[in-house]
Amino acid sequence: MMFARSVNDYNEVYYHKAVAEQAGFNHVLAPPTFMMAVDHYDETYNRRPQPGEVWFGSGRDPISGDVSVRPVPKGGSGFHAEERFIYHRHPVAGETLIVEYRTGKVWSKEGRRGGALTFTEEITEFSDAQGKPVITAIWVSVATVINVGDGKLSDKDLTQEKASDENSPERIEGVHKAVMAGKICHIGDTFEKIVVKDLKRTQLVMYSGASGDFHPFHHDGPFARAKGMDGVFAHGMLTMGITAIAFNDVIDDGALLEYGARFVQPVWPGETLTTKLIVTNIEQGEEQAVVILTIETRNGDSQLVLTGDARVQAANF
């Protein structure tokens, strides 16, 4: 419940057991990005102050301790560039899950500002008490060279290569259609929703507490400004969690098969975000269909802040 509140998602299936049971689950459902909260159970997690160690956020001074290497989770380095969840099934409250970490693919490419960028996948496998897979989470970090010299950043450092602004596919009525949440959908259909209005700094603090990610960039103004930013900005995973609100009116609860996002640029307090879901393909099987969605989240200036995709279980029509 606390996690759902932290991403501004008030779908009752995340709060009330009776509602979840009506949807076919035996307890309240976990929100789509809830697995980020596993970091609460990592005793060495370095985005949370550790006993006896100097925390690098502000105290008397804007920056404390040695920040020559900016801490990041699970051994990665650099910025969180992308995240992907593969849902083997959706977990519910009361379950015990077993967690295993491993490193996935590593690759490099030339950055826009010169120098090589190295991308690393950190894969977290969640299994139930019987050893059956529940969720696979893939965190993609990109190592950069911006944290040298004076160690200061700018919003340009946090902005990835802009995603192409492709037009939606032409709406097609015919063989390729499916039923999501009781409604017929076709390739080219779009669904748009304002997912947050006037994002508050308090929402960033709520997400820090719910997820366990207390990096000072997201709640500590003196630290963020000392590092060259205009102030605090939202966690990429907060933006991804808020974006998922758009699913509530479009798909059935627990129907997500896969959900991925790429963080294009920072989201600042005060911004209003609108998410568009576009049906780009429908894969029809013998018993069920899979709807492919392209995802765009934009700020009030119509700038892309997140792009993504989802695979959704649906009914044939």
Predicted stretch roles:
Residues 3-5, 36, 85, 139, ...:
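Generic structural hydrophobic/aromatic packing signal, biased to beta-strands
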Residues 18, 116, 203, 222, ...:
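Residue-level detector of alpha-helical recognition elements and their boundaries
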Residues 79-193, 267-317:
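HotDog/MaoC-like acyl-thioester-processing domains
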Residues 231, 238-282, 298-300:
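Catalytic-pocket segment enriched in acidic/His residues
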